[in-house]
Amino acid sequence: PHKRMNNAFMMHASTSPFYPLFAALDINAKMHEGVSGRNMWMDCVVNGINARKLILDNCQHIRPFVPELVDGKPWQSYETAQIAVDLRFFKFVPGEHWHSFEGYAENQYFVDPCKLLLTTPGIDARNGEYEAFGVPATILANFLRENGVVPEKCDLNSILFLLTPAEDMAKLQQLVALLVRFEKLLEADAPLAEVLPSIYKQHEERYAGYTLRQLCQEMHDLYARHNVKQLQKEMFRKEHFPRVSMNPQEANYAYLRGEVELVRLPDAEGRIAAEGALPYPPGVLCVVPGEIWGGAVLRYFSALEEGINLLPGFAPELQGVYIEEHDGRKQVWCYVIKPRDAQSALLKGEKL
């Protein structure tokens, strides 16, 4: 019953802001009315640009996600006022290699100036391949939380901060100072107990004697071994989508009727998913009810399971699957549709 309650709630709820509700607030609407509202957000854009410039000038490893060059000149060499009103400085140009994205057209995509996206070492942006050493962004995110700065979210090698008019340069300078401090700790290979004291205290036996670079290397090697970035890409490419076997609504009804069974992740291969499964980030369903477990989705969740066991304290949030401990190891379990003969027996009241 508890799992069904959570399933029903998460199907119709989100942790993301509900923007129509925000827009309906009278005070919020008044603040954004007319020229004053546009000026507030222009100030936010300007602060975001200046923060990116500070990071480019003071950090060697953590970089803002913007073009390296614009018309042959460094991004940060232009005046802030010019950058703030010219989309060239936030534009994805086909053929450029600062991001390793592909399959888009001219003027199709732009970086949102109010989303301060930073990248960490570990993936060569020019070819999309893993480098020998990397700093998974979740380690940086935990360091920032330890020091009172909460990022919006992080992925394999990127971390995101949402900028609003509530952010002033003092806050952004504090963020930059922490980024610089993290890089110094990384270069000095500081003891993990100093960098992430909360996680170290919770898992002292596991991380005894660890340094920051040692943790980064171990997590980076895990991602590279499973080629997790490629799995992420494949999960959202049409040619790799899970095969549909049932109407999603019918699969959900089967779940509500109890015509399902909870199985270990390896045993789910080839079975029909009864729940949508979602790792956060990216916060997007990778398999939906009625689809067949397998392929990139199954391999991705298997990699996450290995990471949960290998590196405690860094588990991502998972929805639609369940972490259960057996024989000292945490395992991922999920609900799948029972075979038809088992469902018939269930309807007849037979014991299964």
Report each predicted region and the residues it spans.
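Active-site PLP attachment segment
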Residues: 1-8, 13-27
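Functionally constrained cores in energy, signaling, and assembly domains
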Residues: 12, 20, 32, 286, ...
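Short glycine/serine- and small hydrophobic-enriched flexible loop segments
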Residues: 26-34
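Non-catalytic terminal extensions of PLP-dependent enzymes
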Residues: 35-352
